UniProtKB/Swiss-Prot annotation:
UniProt organism field: Pelodictyon phaeoclathratiforme (strain DSM 5477 / BU-1)
Purpose: Channel that opens in response to stretch forces in the membrane lipid bilayer. May participate in the regulation of osmotic pressure changes within the cell.
Annotated family: Belongs to the MscL family.
Keyword Repeat: no
Top-level taxon: Bacteria
Subcellular location: Cell inner membrane
Name of the featured protein: Large-conductance mechanosensitive channel
Positions of transmembrane segments: 14-34, 38-58, 86-106
Disulfide bond residue pairs: none
The keyword Transport belongs to this UniProt entry's keyword annotation: yes
GO MF entries: mechanosensitive monoatomic ion channel activity
Keywords: Cell inner membrane, Cell membrane, Ion channel, Ion transport, Membrane, Transmembrane, Transmembrane helix, Transport
Membrane topology: Multi-pass membrane protein
UniProt lineage: Bacteria, Pseudomonadati, Chlorobiota, Chlorobiia, Chlorobiales
Length: 151
């Protein structure tokens, strides 16, 4: 059984998948940092200095302190029940950037993999000049109208 597992684990597809998962995880960290540290601060300034991570809706005030809360962390510490749509926006933007980056990567790989198209095959049929039926190239008579065909 150990031998079978080793054969399975060493197949090309399994190893490729494992490498893809590891690289994907590292790439996800890079994209998350790009979104949270590079893209979101200027975007927040454009919409009035809002930090998306602190965008939330209070469903129920906390028992430890009353609203308003300065930040999501304060609301959470006070025990408030919140809908954190700012964190959701960060996740959506992060996903879109990740998806676009993967699209560009796949597109680049596909451009490198393009194979030359095979030359078109020589024709194996021809058209009868009398009835316009398709007949084999080597035929001397049309099977539809029985006309003699020139070579």
């Amino acid at each position: 059984m150990l031998k079978e597992f080793k054969e399975f684990a060493m197949k090309g597809n399994v190893v490729d998948m494992a490498v893809g998962i590891i690289v994907g995880g590292a790439f996800g960290t890079i994209v998350n940092t790009l979104v949270s540290q590079v893209l979101m601060p200027p975007l927040g300034l454009l919409i009035g200095g809002v930090d998306f991570t602190n965008l939330y809706l209070i469903l129920k005030e906390g028992s430890k302190a009353a609203a308003p809360y300065a930040a999501l962390a304060d609301a959470t510490a006070a025990g408030a029940v919140t809908v954190n749509y700012g964190l959701f926006l960060n996740s959506v933007i992060s996903f879109l950037i990740m998806a676009f980056a993967v699209f560009l990567l796949v597109k680049a790989i596909n451009m490198l993999r393009r194979e030359e198209k095979a030359p078109p095959l020589a024709p194996t049929t021809k058209e009868c000049p009398y009835c316009l039926s398709i007949v084999p190239l080597k035929a001397t008579r049309c099977s539809s109208c029985t006309s003699e065909l020139g070579k």
